[in-house]
């Protein structure tokens, strides 16, 4: 995959064939295999990641993404340290404020201060260090290596936090040249505040993805994923995120209608929201790499010209194994 690197994230909908899916991800050249964390909607994150570790030998593995709200930090540190040992040092921890995992429980998203504390605490715990929190001493005695932490970020303040504290960033604000510039500037501000540079961070860009013989068919299968992006990336504020004023109310209407229990489920109610509120084309341009192979190549080249180089794409499609093979031969090989 010369010129660009790709990771892929899966929804653990079935465990029976998950190992084969992971083997194919590695065999087709992906550099990162992520698993979504949504305990009420999909199978358990770390069970799926254990399968992935046992069925692969090269590819990076980890949650894309977990959160500090539904799992105690010591539990997460123990889980990711165990995965790191099992996989021979291939684990990476994707961390965010929470989405369907928290909303299906009625829990609040992590605050910026909570994310900052989580990054600091998880880094220490996975290094095997003792940490004092809330009058207690926490430690993961079998942890041996500081597992790299990647912060999933959409807003300027979270992007700055990533630049200041994280090992890497998973940018979820979009893929247009304007949004890429805005995001990189925020990450760089945070990096400078910590005496670092943008080059010190491993930056990845999240893309809702599909390939088909026609652009319309590709988009149709990922409308639930586009709705999820609108619901998540703009949930706290639309300010400072490069969204035209006339789109604010349609986005808020979509968010009011969004059902966390149907998060990322094809054919469920959320899939109809992008058309219902007239947002499909905006969301495709903003968040997607989707269409024919030529469409996808053009979208990636546009993003690369703006400064993006590494992309986490979604395998939220009817046949992810066929999708990966086609992606490798008809998109990645062309770049």
Predicted feature residues:
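Hydrophobic faces of well-ordered beta-strands that scaffold small-molecule active sites
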Residues: 4-10, 33-35, 60-64, 91-95, ...
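Acidic (Asp/Glu)-rich catalytic clusters
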Residues: 22-27, 49-60, 80-91, 163, ...
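N-terminal beta1-alpha1-beta2 module of alpha/beta enzyme domains
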Residues: 1-64, 147
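Short, acidic/polar
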Residues: 14-25, 76-79, 153-161, 222, ...
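Alpha-helix-loop-beta-strand connector modules within alpha/beta enzyme cores
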Residues: 46-66, 70, 125, 193, ...
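An alpha-helical appendage that flanks or caps ligand/catalytic pockets
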Residues: 2, 108-140, 180-181, 185, ...
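Conserved, mostly hydrophobic/aromatic
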Residues: 29, 52, 83, 122, ...
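Active-site mouth loops of central-metabolism enzymes
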Residues: 4-16, 66-73, 143-154, 209-212, ...
């Amino acid at each position: 995959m010369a010129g660009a690197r790709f990771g892929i994230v899966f929804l653990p909908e079935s465990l029976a064939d998950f190992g084969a899916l992971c083997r194919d991800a590695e065999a087709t050249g992906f550099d990162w295999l992520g698993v979504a964390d949504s305990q009420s909607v999909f199978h358990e994150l770390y069970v799926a990641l254990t399968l992935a570790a046992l069925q692969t030998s090269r590819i990076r593995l980890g949650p894309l993404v977990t959160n500090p709200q539904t799992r105690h930090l010591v539990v997460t540190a123990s889980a990711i340290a165990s995965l790191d040992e099992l996989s021979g040092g291939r684990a990476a921890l994707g961390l965010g404020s929470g989405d369907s995992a928290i909303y299906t429980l009625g829990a609040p998203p992590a605050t910026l201060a909570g994310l900052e504390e989580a990054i600091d605490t998880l880094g220490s715990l996975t290094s095997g260090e003792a940490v004092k929190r809330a009058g207690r001493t926490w430690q993961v005695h079998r942890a041996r290596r500081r597992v790299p932490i990647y912060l999933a970020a959409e807003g300027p303040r979270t992007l700055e936090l990533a630049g200041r504290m994280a090992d890497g960033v998973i940018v979820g604000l979009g893929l247009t040249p304007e949004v890429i510039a805005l995001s990189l500037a925020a990450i760089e501000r945070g990096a400078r505040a910590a005496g670092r540079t943008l080059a010190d961070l491993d930056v990845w860009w999240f893309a809702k993805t599909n390939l088909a013989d026609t652009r319309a068919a590709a988009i149709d299968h990922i409308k639930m994923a586009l709705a999820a992006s609108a619901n998540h990336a703009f949930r706290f504020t639309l300010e400072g995120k490069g969204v035209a004023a006339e789109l604010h109310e349609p986005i808020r209407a979509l968010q009011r209608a969004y059902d966390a229990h149907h998060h990322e489920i094809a054919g469920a109610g959320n899939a109809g929201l992008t058309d219902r509120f007239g947002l499909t084309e905006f969301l495709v341009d903003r968040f997607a790499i989707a269409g024919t192979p030529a469409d996808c190549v053009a979208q990636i080249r546009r993003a690369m010209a703006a400064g993006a180089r590494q992309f986490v794409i979604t395998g939220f499609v009817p046949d992810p194994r066929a999708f990966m093979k086609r992606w490798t031969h008809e998109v990645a090989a062309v770049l």
